[in-house]
């Protein structure tokens, strides 16, 4: 379990919130100085997501998506708005959501709702979303809160809806990052927590062409 790395839950969440308050509301800020990987990231995410949006009896709809840990809307703008009629955004940092309204431009009119909230306290509206996208943010949740959040996300899905997690993982034990107060989980633990939440993994994909110094990034699709 990775929660043993969290000695004080209140401090764990408070420190992360303070960290993000001091991060510039830019793409480079959202990516911790790795803004140059954004195109590679988004292109891979689009290919991964589109396999579920194609024709077929289990096809995922394109009515509404939710961007979790949305920041200024990097993923909303380049990945979700081009594919979905409406996108909702949730982030713990109010300044980022305010910036999103200008960053998203004209297409931002199709953002349905902005939620300023930590994911540990957020409950998606039942049966609203075709896709719930959770990228580079599960490390800011304890194991217990991640499981309960995924359970709430499951209730938020429309028929044939899917939840997608994209995040850094390790292969040999979870690691705490004291700088931003987050946990990089072992990939086996991520799979275990997904199962604990009552979800089934549909596909897993490793991100290619990222800098060597970054922990490996994997995408998980589930319902």
Curated annotation (Swiss-Prot):
Family, similarity comment: Belongs to the methyltransferase superfamily. NTM1 family.
This enzyme catalyses:
N-terminal L-alanyl-L-prolyl-L-lysyl-[protein] + 3 S-adenosyl-L-methionine = N-terminal N,N,N-trimethyl-L-alanyl-L-prolyl-L-lysyl-[protein] + 3 S-adenosyl-L-homocysteine + 3 H(+); N-terminal L-seryl-L-prolyl-L-lysyl-[protein] + 3 S-adenosyl-L-methionine = N-terminal N,N,N-trimethyl-L-seryl-L-prolyl-L-lysyl-[protein] + 3 S-adenosyl-L-homocysteine + 3 H(+); N-terminal L-prolyl-L-prolyl-L-lysyl-[protein] + 2 S-adenosyl-L-methionine = N-terminal N,N-dimethyl-L-prolyl-L-prolyl-L-lysyl-[protein] + 2 S-adenosyl-L-homocysteine + 2 H(+)
User: Which EC number(s) does the record attach to this protein?
Assistant: 2.1.1.244
Under what name is this protein listed?
Answer: N-terminal Xaa-Pro-Lys N-methyltransferase 1-B
Q: Which InterPro entries match?
A: MeTrfase_NTM1, SAM-dependent_MTases_sf
Gene encoding this chain?
ntmt1-b
Please report the organism this UniProt entry assigns to the protein.
Xenopus laevis
Q: Where in the cell is it found?
A: Nucleus
Q: Name one GO cellular component term.
A: nucleus
Q: Which GO terms describe its biological process?
A: chromosome segregation; N-terminal peptidyl-glycine methylation; N-terminal peptidyl-proline dimethylation; N-terminal peptidyl-serine dimethylation; N-terminal peptidyl-serine trimethylation; spindle organization
Which PANTHER family would you find in this protein's record? AD-003 - RELATED, N-TERMINAL XAA-PRO-LYS N-METHYLTRANSFERASE 1
